[in-house]
Regions:
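Bacterial N-terminal signal peptides
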Residues: 2-13
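Phosphate-binding/catalytic loops
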Residues: 102, 108-151
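A short, aliphatic-rich alpha-helical micro-motif
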Residues: 97-98
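A general, composition-driven signal for non-globular sequence regions
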Residues: 11-12, 31, 130
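Conserved active-site segments centered on acidic
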Residues: 16-92
Length: 151
């Protein structure tokens, strides 16, 4: 009886902070080429999570990766004063899906393993990196909303 009452009270209270032993959220951002949108999302997510004192971290991946990072995205991140995430465009792998607590497809279709994981969401309103500012602004809006759910 007491357990049932406590469970009901906790359910009404909503999400809580993870316990000290709980793994920090790991987000995987995925875009078509793993070179621009997912890179920008990763850079902003990691910066903003750290500013909020969250242990959550992100990585970037691609569905059909390019050989190098987008010159426009790298230049834009540098202008914004952000650290360029380490790495190069890499395909999303089964290990990424397993390690992730959240997977975000930014303007692309994810492989079946990611969509079936129950961890995937899509951000389909982010414009291409032809105009860095509009792309960044849409991504930052989504990242802020995501971080608000991880408090």
């Amino acid at each position: 009886m007491i357990t049932t009452v406590l469970t009901a009270i906790l359910a009404l209270a909503g999400p809580t902070q993870p316990s000290a032993g709980a793994a920090a959220p790991h987000v995987v951002f995925v875009c078509e080429h793993g070179a621009a949108k997912s890179l920008v999302a990763t850079a902003y997510f990691n910066k903003m999570a750290a500013e909020r004192g969250l242990a959550a971290r992100a990585t970037f991946r691609g569905v059909d990766p390019q050989d190098a990072l987008s010159v426009r995205a790298v230049a834009g991140l540098k202008e914004d004063g952000l650290t360029i995430p380490d790495g190069r465009p890499t395909p999303i792998a089964a290990s990424d899906v397993t390690a992730a607590t959240h997977i975000f497809a930014i303007g692309c279709a994810l492989p079946a393993s990611a969509t079936k994981s129950g961890k995937a969401s899509s951000w389909d309103d982010v414009p291409d990196d032809q105009g860095y500012g509009p792309m960044r602004d849409a991504i930052v809006r989504h990242v802020r909303a995501l971080l608000d759910t991880l408090r």
